[in-house]
C-alpha cells in the first residue's frame, strides 16, 4: 500500500460540484475541503458491509443537481450560496480503505482530517457509517473546546460492541472521553 491517504472521487461523478480535486493533502490551500470517508461497517467490512460505503459517491452525485448554479439567488440565505465571496473550495477525494482493516481505516481517516485542518481548510466530511465521526473527533483535538449536539434515535453510548470500542454504537461515548469536548447534548 502506498503512503497516499486519499484517492480521487470515482470518475463517474468527479468531484463535489466540480470543485478542483486535491490529491496532495500536504500541499494545498483552500477555505473548505470536502473529504469522503467511505466505510460501510465498523465491525467487519467484508462480512456484513452495507451500502454506506458508497455514500460519498452518492452525495457527490445527487448534490450536483441541487447545487447547479452557485450564482443563483437563494431566498433562505438572502443571496447566492457563496455570496460573491472569494471562497476556495476543493474536493480531497475519498480516504483509501482496506476491507478487514477497520483500525487502519480509522487511522487513515484521522490523518487525512488532520492534514485538511493543518492546511487551514474547514473539512466537510462525506460519510459512510455512524462510526466515522470517531476519527474525525480525534483529529479535532487541538480545535476545542467543542460543544457536540447529537440528533439521533439512540445514544451511541456502548463501551464495547462485538469486541469493538470504536464502532457505530460507541461514538458519543468516545467523544465524552475526549478532553476537547466541553459539552454534549
What residues fall within each predicted segment?
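Conserved alpha-helical scaffold segments that buttress catalytic/binding sites
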Residues: 2-185
Amino acid at each position: 500500500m502506498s503512503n497516499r491517504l486519499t484517492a480521487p472521487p470515482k470518475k463517474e461523478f468527479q468531484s463535489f460540484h466540480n470543485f478542483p480535486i486535491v490529491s496532495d493533502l500536504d500541499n494545498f490551500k483552500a477555505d473548505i475541503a470536502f473529504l469522503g470517508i467511505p466505510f460501510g461497517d465498523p465491525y467487519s467490512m467484508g462480512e456484513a458491509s452495507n451500502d454506506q460505503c458508497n455514500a460519498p459517491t452518492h452525495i457527490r452525485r445527487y448534490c450536483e443537481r441541487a447545487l447547479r448554479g452557485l450564482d443563483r439567488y437563494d431566498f433562505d440565505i438572502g443571496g447566492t450560496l457563496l455570496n460573491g465571496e472569494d471562497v476556495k473550495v476543493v474536493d480531497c477525494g475519498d480516504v483509501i480503505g482496506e476491507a478487514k482493516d477497520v483500525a487502519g481505516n480509522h487511522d487513515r481517516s484521522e490523518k487525512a482530517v488532520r492534514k485538511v485542518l493543518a492546511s487551514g481548510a474547514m473539512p466537510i466530511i462525506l460519510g459512510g457509517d455512524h462510526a466515522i465521526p470517531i476519527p474525525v473527533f480525534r483529529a479535532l483535538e487541538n480545535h476545542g473546546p467543542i460543544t457536540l449536539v447529537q440528533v439521533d434515535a439512540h445514544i451511541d453510548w456502548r463501551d464495547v460492541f462485538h469486541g469493538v470500542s470504536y464502532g457505530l454504537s460507541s461514538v458519543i461515548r468516545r467523544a465524552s472521553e475526549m478532553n476537547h469536548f466541553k459539552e454534549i447534548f
